[in-house]
């Protein structure tokens, strides 16, 4: 039996394909680090077909994601872990947080010892002491009464990219000779904190090496931008950073109450438990006022021996505050010192338009473009919801598609719902208000990562 010319050519092609075939182990590695842009072979109804890997991701999300969910109608401060339980143990997104020194151009000079930063030069001569985080993906979703927060290292469908960011490791001070906002450990007169009280330098209430206060948000923004002229790369604390740090904590500890007692032990499943403790929130208001007029007293970098870790360190107040040697616990979250308590913190990238009258609205506008940050209008900002009109413990937040953490409804308690307090007041005429987070050293259980005031 003879083959036709066409049949012979087909046989030759089959033999050539077989001869040139490669084992899987012989194939080159893919380029790039996004596997979800790839095509793969699938079998459908007995026929081989190609498919984009991304089309199959809904089935893979549970393996690539970890996060939390809560029923907003339930008063418990505890939330439910969802996704890959192994990721709740390994915390890959969280473990990207690490201390570093950053130069004025935004370049990392060096990464700090993850166990203890005290061996590094942190006085500003080699850069600002910052915590690097980001370079992951997140999703905020709502289904009826259920709110979910999801993190992943991969670009799953519907997830948003969180770029690499840097946040001050300490409450900021100001380099007085240059008016530059600074994150340093430096007790010289050039980095005198507070309101720059030189006559306190030799007293127990010294503000050398302490955070700077009594500065408007406008000036905080200006001092931050002074670090690199003509650039908006440097800023004071921004709402986007504040928001993401809050959700990182909630997902890690599965609680809405950041002031849960600090606990070094893992759960039986291997998860984090507890919170960050009271923090610097337990002073007596009158005694603090008498001691130093509500100015800061915790030195920047006081907890640096904890490195990139989370924990708390005891600080003894001077006898001029209280003869009984009052003690407070300075908390740290993954390298960030005093994430709440001690002193209030201005936040940029959020403006609230508060209308007068009992039927008015307090409209929340946010912005992720630092070039549009301002204190006079809402140009370039997006309306994301309305702030609660009354003071009280937070029961509901705006949440939405971007995980907004601004209170939408009060009626909670110090151990229920969000466990943090919301301050506001209604003006006689329309007013633009900024937002303060964190609380002061005497606010006790009303403090926390979600504690905020509109001023």
Language-model region placement:
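C-terminal, surface-exposed recognition/capping segments
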Residues: 239-243, 265-300, 323, 339-352, ...
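Cytochrome P450 core scaffold surrounding the K-helix E-X-X-R motif
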Residues: 142-143, 177-178, 350-361
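Short aromatic-cysteine micro-motif
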Residues: 120, 124-127, 151-339
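Short hydrophobic/aromatic-rich beta-strand motifs
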Residues: 32-44, 335-337
């Amino acid at each position: 039996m003879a083959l036709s010319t066409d049949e012979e050519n087909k046989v030759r092609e089959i033999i050539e394909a077989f001869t040139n075939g490669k084992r899987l182990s012989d194939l080159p590695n893919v380029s790039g680090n996004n596997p979800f842009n790839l095509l793969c072979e699938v079998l459908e109804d007995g026929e081989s077909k190609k498919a984009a890997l991304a089309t199959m991701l809904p089935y893979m999300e549970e393996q690539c994601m970890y996060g939390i969910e809560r029923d907003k109608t339930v008063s418990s401060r505890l939330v439910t872990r969802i996704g890959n339980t192994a990721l709740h143990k390994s915390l890959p997104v969280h473990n990207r947080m690490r201390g570093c020194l950053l130069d004025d151009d935004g370049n990392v000079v060096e990464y700090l010892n993850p166990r203890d930063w005290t061996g590094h030069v942190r006085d500003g001569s080699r850069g600002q002491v910052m915590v690097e985080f980001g370079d992951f993906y997140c999703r905020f979703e709502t289904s009826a009464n259920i709110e979910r927060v999801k993190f992943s290292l991969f670009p799953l469908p519907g997830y948003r990219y969180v770029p690499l960011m840097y946040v001050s490791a300490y409450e900021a001070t100001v380099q007085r000779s240059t008016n530059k906002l600074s994150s340093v450990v430096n007790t010289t007169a050039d980095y005198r904190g507070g309101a720059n009280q030189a006559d306190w330098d030799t007293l127990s209430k010294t503000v050398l090496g302490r955070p700077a206060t009594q500065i408007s948000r406008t000036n905080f923004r200006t001092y931050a931008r002074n670090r690199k002229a003509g650039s908006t790369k440097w800023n004071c604390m921004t709402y986007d950073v504040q928001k993401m740090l809050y959700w990182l904590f909630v997902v890690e500890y599965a609680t809405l109450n950041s002031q849960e007692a600090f606990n070094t032990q893992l759960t039986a499943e291997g998860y984090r438990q507890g919170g960050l403790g009271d923090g610097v929130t337990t002073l007596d208001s009158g005694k603090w006022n008498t001691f130093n007029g509500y100015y800061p007293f915790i030195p920047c970098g006081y907890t640096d021996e904890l490195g990139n870790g989370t924990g708390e360190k005891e600080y003894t107040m001077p006898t001029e505050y209280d003869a009984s040697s009052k003690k407070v616990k300075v908390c740290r979250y993954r390298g960030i010192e005093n994430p709440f308590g001690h002193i209030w913190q201005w936040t940029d990238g959020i403006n609230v338009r508060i209308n007068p009258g009992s039927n008015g609205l307090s409209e929340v506008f946010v912005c992720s473009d630092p070039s549009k940050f301002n204190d006079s209008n809402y140009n370039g900002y997006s309306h994301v919801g309305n702030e609660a009109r009354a003071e009280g413990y937070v029961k509901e937040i705006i949440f939405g598609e971007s995980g907004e953490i601004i209170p939408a409804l009060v009626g909670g308690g110090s151990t229920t719902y969000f466990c943090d307090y919301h301050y506001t007041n209604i003006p006689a005429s329309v007013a633009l208000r900024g937002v303060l987070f964190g609380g002061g050293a005497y606010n006790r259980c009303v403090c926390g990562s979600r504690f905020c005031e509109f001023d």
